[in-house]
From Swiss-Prot:
It is found in: Cytoplasm. Belongs to the NAD kinase family. The active site is at residue 74. GO terms for molecular function: ATP binding; metal ion binding; NAD binding; NAD+ kinase activity. The keyword Cytoplasm applies. Its EC number is 2.7.1.23. PANTHER family: NAD KINASE. Its cofactor is a divalent metal cation. It catalyses: NAD(+) + ATP = ADP + NADP(+) + H(+). GO terms for biological process: NAD metabolic process; NADP biosynthetic process. This is NAD kinase. The gene is nadK.
Amino acid sequence: MGSTLFKTIALIGKHKNPDIMTPLLNLAEYLTDRGTSVVLDDLTAAHIGKNQYPVVALEEIGRQADLAIVLGGDGTMLNIARTLVPFSVPLIGINQGRLGFLTDLTVDTMYATLNDMLAGQFIVENRMLLTTEVTRHGESVFKELAFNDVVLHRGISSGMIELEVHINGEYVYSLRSDGLIIATPTGSTAYALSSGGPILHPGLNLMILVPVCPHTLSNRPIVIGADAVIEIKIHYTTETKIYTDSHSWFDLGEHDRVLVRRCPETIKLLHPVHHSYYRMLREKLGWSSILQKNSR
């Protein structure tokens, strides 16, 4: 039995994924043997079936747990992070998805790594979020948090959307395109990356605006400070929607205004001491794989 800095640890699994049951229960037993209290969120508990661990609503985890360990992919981490951000509960991610930009650990090696992390050997990284609000005729009609990005997209309509972008009250440009992405450094490796945006190190206090298939090729991605306030005015739309982390969405109408700004709270991620952001990029994006294969 080892020592741990965390007295109560919440375990949260990717819902409706049959592969998480065994590793999650094994992890719960491992933590219990270390003298840690383990709680499960209600959706995870419902998926894995009857067990001896206390079950609480996801919102209650923030009030009860000192740490949350998430088994799943980046989507699971995004959802949990948005819920727990008001409580400053640190997160550790164990990858059960595909790429896993946010989930450092693997199921095969998690125990050796957790031994060190639970004893205090970890790196703390604070990641920014965005708040977005839609106003219509002066009234707020939609408000949500985003860890990755806020996306305005034309949806299934064949026509482009037309909008104006203002930053800190100053007109910047007009845009005719399939959409616009406003991303955090965390979200720079998601939809923004596939749309031609730059990769931002997560330690930077920046945001990026990335047009999606702009009609004018001079509409390029731009990088702005994290303290900027972005206002988007919708001029023409048919079926345009706004998405936050591909999770929540809302139908936009002409003359709606979208405000995007930095959230005052941050997400606290815990990494192993040997964590390297650049090594993670090499592994996830396959950088230099051909050179390594053909090197002499």
